[in-house]
Amino acid sequence: MARYDLVDRLNTTFRQMELALATFVAELEQHRLLIARVFSLPEVKKEDEHNPLEQIEVKQHLGTEAESLALRHFRHLFIQQQSENRSSKAAVRLPGVICYQVDDNTRPLLEEHVKRINELKMAFEHIVTVESGLPTAARFEWVHRHLPGLITLNAYRTLTVINDPATLRFGWANKHIIKNLRRDDVLAQLEKSLKSPRSVYPWTREEWQAKLEREYQDIASLPQEAKLKIKRPVKVQPIARVWYKGDQKQVQHACPTPLIALINTDNGAGVPDIGELLNYDAANVQHRYKPQAQPLRLIIPRLHLYVAD
């Protein structure tokens, strides 16, 4: 019964999110568009989801075309809404900003609507990732059994509202996920895998078992106090740097989806200055500051697991 209730809440929360998004988009369309600039990125094809991105060619869209793409993007939740060649495992990204004229009465209404949408998105994600009690690999099948074709990352992704920005500049951010581990924690993880033998493409079951045993021995041979860490690169992300003249401060936002800028003309706010997003080229990335890295030796490549020398 509890599992049935969870599925019911999964579906109910998602339908509420869909309705809230549709209503919000209709509300935005009633407001005057001041300026819009979004940047479409090449689609990620099936089988290319995990390939490193060395170059990204950006296409710019302005005005009502940009607005149309942005509003459609907010409601892009299913693979049926995209090319059949595009991967369903990679979320669609559309950095940029759409700016609308608001006043003292309409701004709080729009902000409240976005707050409600984001609450539903976070509740939906919590149902899938926490309340389901399922491991990561099993969640995909569970969600798609009840919501076939759902792009879960698009469903999780919240909307970002900004108020009266003076300037917006776009760029790219390179990051790593870093997690420190103890030797015994890694051994426990490998031991768990050894006790549930399976085949992992392109290895047979026996080959995979032998590979795990070698990895186990490699870790077991390390001193107990060895410093281990997972250092996994995250795909380059579009970001927006927003300058607020009144507060004299800059705020950086992740920008996988268009920012929604509300311009309150009652307060004398004007149309912001919006920069462009340049093509990404990994070979020409310049770091403002790159600290001296700790010497690390890769010990289990598939886990991005390193040991400090």
Swiss-Prot record:
GO terms for cellular component: cytoplasm
Primary site of residence: cytoplasm
InterPro entries named in the record: DNA_replication_term_site-bd, Tus_dom1, Tus_sf
Taxonomic superkingdom: Bacteria
Gene Ontology MF terms: DNA binding
GO biological process, one term: DNA replication termination
SUPFAM superfamilies: Replication terminator protein (Tus)
Subcellular location per the Swiss-Prot or TrEMBL entry: Cytoplasm
Keywords tagged on the record: Cytoplasm, DNA replication, DNA-binding
Family of this protein: Belongs to the Tus family.
Protein function: Trans-acting protein required for termination of DNA replication. Binds to DNA replication terminator sequences (terA to terF) to prevent the passage of replication forks. The termination efficiency will be affected by the affinity of this protein for the terminator sequence.
Name of the featured protein: DNA replication terminus site-binding protein
Organism expressing this protein natively: Escherichia fergusonii (strain ATCC 35469 / DSM 13698 / CCUG 18766 / IAM 14443 / JCM 21226 / LMG 7866 / NBRC 102419 / NCTC 12128 / CDC 0568-73)
Organism placement in taxonomy: Bacteria, Pseudomonadati, Pseudomonadota, Gammaproteobacteria, Enterobacterales
